[in-house]
């Protein structure tokens, strides 16, 4: 009983949003730059899954297993770097750098959305959720999940060869390494949510673990091994200090745990205390984006 088999296939395209194509804005010294030449991304997605219910005594729930595959053409992603403040050109060579200075257009640091070419993302999603009834007043609800993702840049070989042949001192690369992976992705992700209820009281926790980030923007970090520093290494040091060393030491898998304790004061009023990042773990999924430290929150909810 309670067995389900599902499959899906979809195909379509997505036009760039107004923000991705036209927005120009400065936020805290970092700019967002428009790209009117950005193209719509196209692709298709296929998924096959199986869902099975289970019941063992007072324990009941579902387990869900799904495999997915997505293929993109002209995939849209953002790139971080230097830009001409007037023409919004991405600075990827000495000539563009000198032109920005000589023309008086000026330079800015920021992000711009662009097409990265062909990509495929596939993986497996495993999850289970259920409830265990201890007695009439006590129950434990849980959700456990694991996701494996393999995000592949299908044009990596030709792009690496083109970038390697470029001997411009200010030549930019698409990402921080020569791997086949897309930027800002993690291969493995694990989560767990548990909530124990007893009469009007409840205590719960959220736990998550993610593996290291596979690649980031070259403008901030270069993970390649070099005999001597190049011009971009000196520029990074001036702009971002020891960010390169920090990322090399801290780009690892990280575990974060949150806790919460609550009570129903009346039928309509609920009070809950939360501690986010209980272990005060220092973590970062992207350079210059450090996760929030331990945080205490008190919530009061009312239904009328």
Give residue spans per PLM region.
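Outer-membrane beta-barrel strand-turn architecture
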Residues: 1, 42, 54-57, 71, ...
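Transmembrane beta-barrel domains of outer membrane proteins
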Residues: 10, 49-53, 120, 127-131, ...
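Flexible, surface-exposed loop regions and adjacent strand-edge segments
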Residues: 22-30, 79-88, 153-174, 220-229, ...
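Residues that define the transmembrane beta-barrel architecture of outer-membrane proteins
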Residues: 42-46, 120-124, 186-190, 253-257, ...
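Surface-exposed extracellular loop regions of Gram-negative outer-membrane beta-barrel proteins
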Residues: 1-46, 67-111, 213-214, 280-293
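Transmembrane beta-barrel strands of outer-membrane/channel proteins
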Residues: 7-11, 20, 50, 63-69, ...
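Gram-negative outer-membrane beta-barrel transporters
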Residues: 58, 66-71, 90-219
């Amino acid at each position: 009983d309670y067995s389900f088999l599902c499959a899906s296939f979809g195909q379509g395209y997505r036009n760039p949003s107004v923000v991705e194509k036209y927005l120009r804005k400065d936020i805290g010294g970092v700019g967002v730059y428009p790209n009117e030449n950005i193209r719509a991304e196209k692709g298709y997605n296929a998924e096959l899954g199986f869902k099975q219910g289970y019941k063992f005594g007072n324990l009941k729930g579902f387990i869900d297993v799904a495999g997915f595959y997505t293929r993109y053409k002209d995939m849209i992603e953002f790139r971080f770097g230097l830009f001409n403040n007037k023409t919004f050109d991405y600075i990827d060579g000495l000539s563009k750098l000198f032109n920005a200075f000589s023309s008086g257009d000026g330079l800015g640091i920021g992000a711009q959305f662009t097409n990265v070419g062909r990509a495929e993302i596939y993986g497996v999603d495993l999850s289970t959720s259920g409830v265990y009834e201890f007695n009439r007043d006590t129950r434990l609800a849980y959700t456990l999940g694991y996701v494996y993702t393999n995000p592949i840049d299908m044009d990596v070989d030709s792009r690496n060869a083109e970038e390697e042949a470029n001997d411009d001192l200010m030549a930019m690369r698409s990402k921080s390494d020569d791997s086949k992976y897309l930027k800002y992705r993690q291969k493995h992700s694990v989560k767990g949510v548990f909530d124990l209820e007893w009469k009007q009281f409840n205590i719960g926790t959220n736990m998550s673990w993610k593996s290291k980030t596979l690649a980031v923007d070259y403008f901030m970090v270069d993970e390649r091994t070099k005999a001597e520093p190049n011009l971009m290494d000196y520029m990074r040091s001036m702009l971002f200090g020891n960010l390169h060393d920090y990322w090399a030491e801290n780009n690892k898998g990280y575990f974060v745990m949150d806790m919460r304790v609550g009570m129903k004061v009346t039928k309509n009023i609920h009070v809950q205390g939360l501690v986010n990042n209980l272990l005060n773990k220092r973590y970062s999924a992207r350079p210059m984006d450090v996760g929030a430290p331990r945080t205490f929150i008190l919530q009061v909810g009312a239904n009328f």
